[in-house]
């Protein structure tokens, strides 16, 4: 019974591979993307598959290395370091993706969202990093997304310590539901 199921899944996967390849091959020109940028590489494929006619409703791409318990910033400049580089790569990749969607004339059909499975603490630890926290920002983007900041700036106490968290203002599941 299990082997029959595995064979069925393998057959379906093989058939769907043909559909995915046809969608990818249907697009011969795209707007430029930054390199090297692993997130941009993935978003370029997503734009290609959407324009190529793949009917997938939700695509998920991943970009790691945000688990910055140490060396998140430089010791002399909190706006420089590995975290700043990560955020620049995200920004550059999303900008290229949006430019490509416009070039491909499909920007009206796509909405994007960033999310993380964990937030960060308010205050840096002794290793110039931050530990896991409760809340995290989410960014929604796309031509039809209303440009607005939701939520209030949190009050951060003067005596904040490395164990303090920012409380969540919105349940991430409600944001997911709104996107659907």
Model-flagged regions — what are they?
Residues 134:
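Glycine-rich and small/hydrophobic secondary-structure elements
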Residues 119-127:
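Basic/polar, cationic surfaces and motifs that engage anionic cell-wall
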Residues 127, 131, 139-140:
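Active-site substrate-binding loop specific to GH73 endo-beta-N-acetylglucosaminidase modules
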Residues 110-119:
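Acidic/histidine-rich, metal-coordinating catalytic segments
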